[in-house]
Structures are given as structure tokens and as C-alpha cells.
């Protein structure tokens, strides 16, 4: 509710002029002027000394949490816990079944004829050496190291980049090619930094013929031959 403030006004007091200065009454025929006096404290109800006169009332409604949201959150948590429990149960059941099957298989091999057991042991013991022997049967000059895989990947990347560079050089002969469109803009952004390296080294012939792409292709071919020689 709004605050109710009481305001009190005092009526002014009129005093005749004869009470204060009677000498003006005999000289003029007009009625004496009236004087207005106001009290020193016209609004005592609003003074600081009377704080009880100003009242402020405020009401705040209590915050109520919606029951619907709590019910939804509990339902979601229950579904999550239920699904987690079901997955854990299935995983435990699968592990138990595989363990039982492995035990039964080992018992069956032990109780079977010794010929089958000896053949199984022989096949398992010779599988590893045969695998590593097949890895060693490589042509001469082959590097059986992790760097070989990296070298093969670099060689393939150089071949692809050489093809893209060839497309860029061939299309540069046509002046009306829209290089702002895709995929032409991607080709330009990929090849121009590499071509600019050689344009600064070899200037154009007669200021018209640019032969710097020939040097760029020669460098790519040299790198490709080096990588191919390292892979064997």
C-alpha cells in the first residue's frame, strides 16, 4: 500500500496596522493595510524530528518454486540412472558369458585328444614368426621404419599439388576467368604464395612472359624424386 502522509496547514494571522504603527491611521482615509505573518514551522508533520509521520509500507510476495520443474528434473534423473544401470548390467552379463565360454573351451581342449591340442599350440606359436617374416620380405632399399609412411604421404601430396599448380598456370592464360568464385578462389589462394616465391627470383621476359612456374615445377619434381628414392 502507498504511504499516507498527513499534512497540516496553519491559517495566517491578520493584524491591523494600527496595532503596529498607529501614526498612519490619522493621515490617510484609506483602511490600514493588512500584514501577513507565517509560522516558522508551517509543516511540522514533515520535519525530521517527527519520523513517525512518514510511513512507508511495502509487501513482497514469497518466491515459490514451481513443482512442475522439480518433477521433470526428477523424472529425467531417474531415466538416466535407469539407462545407466541397464547398460552396466548388460556389460557385466557379456563379460561373465565370455569368461564362462573361455573356461569351457580351455577345459574342452585339455580333455580332448592330445593331437588337437598339439596342433593348436603349434599354429599359435608359428603365427607370430610367419607374420614378422612376411614383413621382412621386402625389395632391397626398402626402409622398414615409420618414416616410410610419412615419405609415401608426402609423395602423394606433392603429386596432387603439382596437378593443382598445373591447373592454376593453365587458367592464368585466360584473362576472363572469375577467380572470385569457388573453387577457383581456393586454387588461387593455394598456389599463388608458392608461385610468388619464384616470381621474385626470375623476372618476366620482355615484361610479358612469366617463366617462373617452370622453376616451381622443377623444384616440385626434385622433391618428389627424393621422396620416391627414400621409400624405395
Curated annotation (Swiss-Prot):
Transmembrane parts of this sequence: 147-167, 201-221
InterPro entries named among the record's database cross-references: CCB3/YggT
Protein keywords: Chloroplast, Membrane, Plastid, Thylakoid, Transit peptide, Transmembrane, Transmembrane helix
GO BP term, example: nucleoid organization
Subcellular location: Plastid, Chloroplast thylakoid membrane
Record: transit peptide: 1-16
A Pfam short name: YGGT
Membrane topology value: Multi-pass membrane protein
Cellular component per GO, a single term: cytosol
Described purpose of this protein according to its UniProt entry: Required for the proper distribution of nucleoids in chloroplasts. The nucleoid partitioning by YLMG1-1 may be related to chloroplast division processes.
Misc: Plant over-expressing YLMG1-1 have impaired chloroplast division leading to reduced number and enlarged chloroplasts in mesophyll cells. Plants silencing YLMG1-1 show a pale green phenotype in young emerging leaves and the basal part of expanding leaves.
Similarity comment text for this entry: Belongs to the YggT family.
Official protein name in the record: YlmG homolog protein 1-1, chloroplastic
Gene encoding the protein: YLMG1-1
Amino acid at each position: 500500500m502507498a504511504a499516507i502522509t498527513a499534512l497540516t496547514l496553519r491559517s495566517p494571522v491578520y493584524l491591523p496596522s494600527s496595532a503596529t504603527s498607529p501614526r498612519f491611521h490619522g493621515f490617510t482615509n484609506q483602511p490600514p493595510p493588512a500584514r501577513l505573518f507565517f509560522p516558522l514551522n508551517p509543516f511540522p508533520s514533515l520535519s525530521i524530528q517527527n519520523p513517525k509521520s512518514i510511513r512507508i509500507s511495502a509487501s513482497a510476495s514469497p518466491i515459490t518454486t514451481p513443482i512442475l520443474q522439480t518433477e521433470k528434473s526428477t523424472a529425467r534423473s531417474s531415466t538416466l540412472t535407469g539407462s545407466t544401470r541397464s547398460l552396466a548390467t548388460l556389460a557385466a552379463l557379456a563379460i561373465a558369458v565370455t569368461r564362462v565360454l573361455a573356461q569351457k573351451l580351455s577345459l574342452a581342449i585339455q580333455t580332448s585328444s592330445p593331437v588337437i591340442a598339439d596342433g593348436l599350440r603349434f599354429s599359435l606359436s608359428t603365427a607370430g614368426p610367419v607374420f614378422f617374416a612376411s614383413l621382412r620380405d621386402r625389395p632391397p632399399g626398402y626402409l622398414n621404419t615409420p618414416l616410410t609412411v610419412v615419405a609415401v604421404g608426402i609423395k602423394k601430396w606433392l603429386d596432387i599439388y603439382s596437378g593443382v599448380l598445373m591447373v592454376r598456370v593453365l587458367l592464368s592464360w585466360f584473362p576472363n576467368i572469375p577467380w572470385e568464385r569457388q573453387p577457383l578462389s581456393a586454387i588461387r589462394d593455394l598456389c599463388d604464395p608458392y608461385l610468388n616465391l619464384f616470381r621474385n627470383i626470375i623476372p618476366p621476359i620482355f615484361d610479358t612472359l612469366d617463366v617462373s612456374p617452370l622453376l616451381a615445377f622443377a623444384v616440385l619434381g626434385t622433391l618428389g624424386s627424393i621422396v620416391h628414392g627414400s621409400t624405395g
